[in-house]
């Protein structure tokens, strides 16, 4: 079988040529042409995928390609998607998209079908026919939309019908935040627990769970009270891996409050004693700040489970581990920091993201500011 070829058509357009489909009586396959928009490397990856389908006998004529076959082919291995994202996309495709739209020919999908599908998910797309949240339905629509955009680039379809159907509106909900009194109670009840230094660190920095699990001592400067966020730990079905921050804003330096520095110094001493017992010697710059007791990496999902267990066993406020990040952000806002500064410290892609999540907190500060202005302008007697 021919290895196929790639010919440039424009600045970012390529024609992929390969032999595909069922062979005729002479054993010859029909020559296929596919237009691809993107970089040459991406075009080469796509050609390799198409040839692999032909070899595996799973190649289908574009007009006969169903949504199920297309999504499974795309999500079989997309080099542009992070492993965790790919895992989540596959889950959404298999659970929310394919059971409802999978049998429809990709080229025959219409906006009305997408609209009806979203309604079905909202009413009973969950396990046992339970309703799905608008947020989850929106995630499923995003997977379909992204898949159709790719099919459009490949000229398998002439338009992306998902563009005509907006995602269901997600009602704004206030995030879980610990009050000052609750913070004190949590730290008091956790004192002496292995999670204590992690919780203090999370509250004091607002770092994400994966960033905390992936933090190495080489990125911590206790003398300068500074931490460099350079990577995150990601957990997928294939195991653990370190990955760079999602956006440029995610790579940042975070200053440490004095009490967090003190807790980290004590934690490092305790960790050193534990390493000596294990015969591991002094912790190096590549060693993790918050590993498991045997010095192995602390999986982010396990951290969440351990937090949930200690919440129940010690009667702590019923909030997720991520709520510690929200609590940190709320403290910054309450202290009067502007949205740009808050966004920079917690590593959001843009201040707009920060405003979307914490709009109600900024509004309360604005109300206080308005009241202060009114008081200042009140006539003196």
What are these regions (language model features)?
Residues 1-35, 84, 224-226, 231:
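Short, Arg/Lys-rich segments that mark the N-terminal edge of DNA/RNA- and chromatin-recognition modules
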Residues 2, 188, 224, 233-260, ...:
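C-terminal secondary-structure termini that scaffold catalytic or DNA-interacting sites
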Residues 37-54:
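A short, charged, amphipathic alpha-helix used as a generic interaction element across diverse proteins
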Residues 46, 61-152, 161-166, 182, ...:
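Short, Lys/Arg-enriched alpha-helical recognition elements, typified by the DNA-recognition helix
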Residues 126-130, 185-196, 205, 254, ...:
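Short, basic (Lys/Arg/His-rich) helix/loop patches that form interaction surfaces
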Residues 130-134, 138-142, 153-215, 222-223, ...:
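Basic, Lys/Arg- and aromatic-enriched nucleic-acid-binding interface segment
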Residues 162-164, 224-229, 320, 331, ...:
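Short functional hotspots where side chains directly engage DNA or cofactors
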């Amino acid at each position: 079988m021919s290895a196929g070829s790639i010919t440039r058509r424009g600045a970012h357009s390529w024609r992929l040529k390969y032999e595909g489909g069922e062979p005729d009586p002479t054993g010859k396959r029909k020559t296929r042409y596919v237009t691809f928009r993107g970089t040459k490397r991406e075009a080469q990856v796509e050609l390799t995928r198409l040839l692999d389908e032909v070899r595996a006998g799973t190649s289908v004529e574009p007009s006969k390609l169903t949504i199920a076959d297309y999504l499974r082919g795309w999500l079989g291995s997309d080099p542009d998607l992070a492993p965790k994202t790919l895992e989540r996309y596959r889950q959404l495709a298999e659970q929310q998209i394919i059971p409802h739209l999978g049998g429809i020919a990709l080229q025959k999908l219409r906006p009305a079908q997408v609209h009806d599908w979203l309604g079905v998910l909202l009413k009973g797309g969950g396990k046992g026919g339970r309703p799905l949240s608008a947020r989850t339905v929106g995630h499923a629509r995003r997977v379909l939309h992204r898949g159709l955009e790719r099919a459009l680039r490949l000229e398998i379809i002439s338009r992306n019908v998902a563009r005509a159907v907006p995602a269901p509106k997600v009602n704004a909900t206030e995030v879980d935040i610990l009050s000052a009194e609750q913070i004190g109670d949590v730290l008091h009840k956790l004192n002496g627990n292995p999670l204590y230094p992690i919780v203090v660190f999370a509250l004091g920095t607002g770092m994400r769970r994966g960033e905390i699990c992936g933090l190495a001592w080489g990125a911590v400067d206790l003398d300068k009270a500074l931490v460099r966020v350079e990577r995150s730990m990601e957990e997928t079905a294939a195991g653990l891996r370190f990955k760079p921050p999602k956006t440029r804003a995610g790579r940042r330096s975070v200053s440490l409050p004095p009490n967090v520095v003190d807790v980290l110094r004590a934690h490092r001493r305790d960790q050193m004693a534990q390493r000596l017992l294990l015969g591991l010697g002094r912790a190096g710059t590549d060693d993790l700040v918050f590993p498991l007791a045997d010095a192995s990496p602390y999986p982010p999902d396990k951290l969440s489970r351990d937090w949930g267990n200690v919440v129940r066993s010690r009667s702590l406020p019923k909030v997720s581990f991520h709520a510690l990040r929200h609590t940190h952000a709320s403290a910054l806002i309450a202290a009067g920091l502007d949205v740009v500064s808050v966004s920079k410290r917690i590593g959001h892609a843009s201040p707009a993201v920060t405003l979307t999540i914490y709009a109600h907190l900024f509004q309360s500060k604005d109300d206080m500011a308005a009241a202060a202005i009114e008081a200042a302008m009140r006539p003196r007697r």
